[in-house]
Amino acid sequence: MTAQHQATGTAPGANLSAHTPMMQQYLTLKAENPEILLFYRMGDFYELFYDDARKASQLLDISLTKRGQSAGSPIPMAGVPYHAIEGYLAKLVQLGESAAICEQVGDPATSKGPVERKVIRIITPGTVSDEALLSERQDNLIAAVYHDGRRFGYGTMDIGSGRFFINQFEKEETLLAELQRTNPAELLYPESFTFLHHVEGRRGLRRRPEWEFELGTARKLLCQQFGTQDLVGFGVEQSETALCAAGCLMQYVKDTQRTALPHIRSVRLEQPDHAVIMDAATRRNLELTQNLAGGHDNTLSAVLDCTATPMGSRLLKRWIHQPIRDQVILKGRQSTIKELIEQNLYDELGGLLRQVGDVERVLARLALRSARPRDLTRLRQAFAQLPELQRLLAESEHEAVQQLRERASTFPELLDLLERAVMEVPPVLIRDGGVIRDGFNQELDELRDLANGATASLARIEERERLLTGINTLKVGYNKVHGFYIEVSRANSHLVPAHYIRRQTLKNNERYIIDELKKYEDKVLTAQAQALALEKRLYEELLDALLPHLGDLQESAAALAELDVLANLAERAETLDYRCPTLIDEDQILIEAGRHPVVEQVMTDPFIANPINLQRSRRMLIITGPNMGGKSTYMRQTALIVLLAHIGAFVPADSARIGPIDRIFTRIGASDDLASGRSTFMVEMTETANILNNATARSLVLMDEIGRGTSTYDGLSLAWACAEQLASKIGAYTLFATHYFELTRLPELMEGLANVHLDAVEHGDTIAFMHAVQEGAASRSYGLQVAALAGVPKSVIQQARHKLHELESATPVAAGESRPAPVAMAPQSHPVVDELEAVRPDELTPRQALDLLYRLKQML
């Protein structure tokens, strides 16, 4: 060991002969897996040494100790029990770490020197398939990114389903949006990657050698995987930058899985013009699957996701994060949801699908030959539901429903095989035995009879020996340490025949063995070992019998997941009173009585629904009103309703007519980006620049309080210029919320703009927010009243009122003047009285009357 290694305790890189044979074996295996933690099997433990031990001790909160010496220095060591390994691996995966599992593969009885060991699996965050290591309702993706100097190539793979997608684009903003959308558990990048500032801080980062991104290598690997001569049939042949990323992905997955990947059967190019594009800021601000605090409560998916299966839940989240523009597909989803509601099928479908479970990931483990016995029982249970699902779907004549019915095939032969082959409730692992059902294989039955027949045979031996020895208390027994034995009390030991051989002495008893019992023991133990070996072979044959059907099984699983999502959306529409939006070709967003899908679920009072009308002659709304008045909610609900329409779902509104949308942008709220050294204002301007550079006439843009982070005149000027650009040059559908009342003049100066405001009623020092959108500009911002509601001291509010009066009167008070007297407030009538005086009862619908009643109650 070098001086450096002696000082640090790290594993040496040369001169293995100085180490013990066991450590030589370890160091050789570690050299093959230098960058990941190596769990080295030693008896009932997995042990880690040197730097791996130190790192594991910190990450897993396990003790760091020493294991003797090798090459003259102590060996740092940490370990975990073999039966608890899955829990520790799960923690490592969550932390973005990888691990290599090294098992004993040789026979200790015949080994000369250390028992042969080898790495049998490598666990990485993006390639795990074990059920215990995955979040069942979240996709677990591995991704690779490459830049060729002109454009980015980006690829994602889901080992748990076999989905494999690539994409290429030119802008860094698109890379950020893709990373936000796909959220890979592991990200591969080349050594020369110069955009690390976009990925730094992510877990699961892996730097890979340049050769893994070579185009020729990528084409060869992919053609080998798919069994084709070229990639033309997949439509990706010309996407060379993306193929470089795909090649690295395939190489890495093959290296880590160390087995064939039959469930990865194609690669698809994602077309940006097929989707409604959302950047990273938009996904964050709309709180689609993650709220602003990083949790999952009070998000769109939390409201929408009542799916029956984990694979359905994952598909729904993919739909939410990638709304589409193809109206044929969207209208097909809408009509299917309508059919499931009208035929009242969604509830019964949900009950059946709950019994299907997560077939998608079971099939992935089957493809990787890592399926466990209970995976096969889950498949059997799923197969058993399919005939009833087919019968239920046959009740509908709807074309799309029948297409789903055809795709969700039944597999009676496989169901019969699994029913005959697998125990009702098998053990977790095949190594425990007892997986194959009695009667499936005659040879296995005979071996089991021999192994399990010990009870009757031992009873006969026991009865005979009692008669021969005259010892009525003589017993024949068995334990794992000493095997079979004849037990005699100490008091009767003098009656034992001479051919009895003492095996064990206890406090009150003696235990013996005889030749016949020893031979029987050998026979039984041999039968048990043979039965277990045969059972393992039969289990592998079961997997072999299932694998040829993998493609059909995957197609059926995909149909079941889609059916689950559509049935779930039907249930949500009925339960939450959503309506089917009308998708049109004209430039219009017309929503009657729209509601925020999340906010209305967390409110105790009824949600105040609001309309919106955007069209060619009215493309921008300047929104004014008090803080807390509901401007941001109104803007977000519009975006969410448009998004829901573009996943084919029903929407929270009385009606909606929605024209083509290509992008959704939001510039709502901001905070300092301390890691990048950017102020709140800089973050705001960066997001604004992205909108102004990329929005089109068919984009939906939400702009909230542009220009707040700088001086009043700078902010007003920027807000004015941004509004003009969006309205006159770009022509995007725009909701522009502002506190700059000067902007309310824009509709007088330009076509296509309109003022709306959210109403509030003031009474004395209090304010009641109506949350109702009205035409025209707000008369004031009510900032002082909101400050009072927030608990700002009354003396400060009083001083602010005086200063406001001065500013509005343009008569500033000289510096150093004494404290001003309170500004007298004009007598005001009660707001409830004002509201009632304006009501025309005969013109109110029952719904409007109920809403009015709740508003009046809020004002008291």
UniProtKB/Swiss-Prot annotation:
ATP binds at G625, P626, N627, M628, G629, G630, K631, S632. GO terms for molecular function: ATP binding; ATP-dependent DNA damage sensor activity; damaged DNA binding; mismatched DNA binding. GO terms for cellular component: cytosol. Transmembrane segments: none annotated. PROSITE patterns: DNA_MISMATCH_REPAIR_2. GO terms for biological process: mismatch repair. The keyword Hydrolase does not apply. InterPro entries: DNA_mismatch_repair_MutS (IPR005748), DNA_mismatch_repair_MutS-lik_N (IPR007695), DNA_mismatch_repair_MutS/MSH (IPR017261), DNA_mismatch_repair_MutS_C (IPR000432), DNA_mismatch_repair_MutS_clamp (IPR007861), DNA_mismatch_repair_MutS_core (IPR007696), DNA_mismatch_repair_MutS_N (IPR016151), DNA_mismatch_repair_MutS_sf (IPR036187). SMART domains: MUTSac, MUTSd. Keywords: ATP-binding, DNA damage, DNA repair, DNA-binding, Nucleotide-binding. NCBIfam families: mutS1, PRK05399.1. This protein is involved in the repair of mismatches in DNA. It is possible that it carries out the mismatch recognition step. This protein has a weak ATPase activity. Belongs to the DNA mismatch repair MutS family. This is DNA mismatch repair protein MutS. It comes from Aeromonas hydrophila subsp. hydrophila (strain ATCC 7966 / DSM 30187 / BCRC 13018 / CCUG 14551 / JCM 1027 / KCTC 2358 / NCIMB 9240 / NCTC 8049). The lineage of its organism: Bacteria, Pseudomonadati, Pseudomonadota, Gammaproteobacteria, Aeromonadales. The gene is mutS.
